[in-house]
Amino acid sequence: MTINQISVFLENKPGQLAEFTRLLEEKQIDMRALSIAETQNFGILRLITDDPYKTVNVVKEAGYVCSVTPVLAVALSDKPGSLVKLLTALGEGNINVEYTYAFIARKKDLAYMVFQVDNPEKAMQIL
């Protein structure tokens, strides 16, 4: 399934992530997944929420720079070898995984992963 990921630029200094997540709490936005890629001066927060459109509006109104990217959300059996099977299938289909991170779920026996790939349509066919 394709979902919308929000990428937000945060200053790389103490308290910035707490301030940002407090904003989401105040606006009753529930985070489902997050990942941070950092550089010396700023971080890129990749975020999945329960309402991406509301999130973008709230984030922009608060003065943050953000963008929206479609990514794949994939459910895997929560057992050894599930991820390697998926990655092997993508590799054999010549799909490059640009990054991935875990997704918080409430279903038993399943693990969810978010994938940014170079060809989402083809990846969906493979999966």
Segments the model singles out, each with a brief description of its role:
Residues M1-L127:
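A conserved regulatory-domain signal marking ACT and ACT-like small-molecule sensing domains
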